[in-house]
């Protein structure tokens, strides 16, 4: 794999260069850890307000993301994924521009949805590649 060149945009607009700032991403109030190769989120207690994050990978890059429910996402070059820092009790939804491979953690009570423009892919737990 090549270099990641990925950037994370936090809800307050801060941009984190994930390749440069690896190993130190236990930011105050955030529930993720970055090791320079992947970004891993952890479940939070119910009732905490959902914050939307955006992972952006430019041309020539790639990055792996583990969402709070354990779903693994490989985000390809020239792609962007908007996702919550944790999921609600009844649904799991992300928004994709570009291409990604998903290994979705099975949860029959909370469908997993990928929104791609005016299209939506909804699954309960499976692996698939999608490009928009």
Model-derived features: positions:
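Short acidic/polar, Gly/Pro-enriched loop/turn segments located at secondary-structure boundaries
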Residues: 1-132
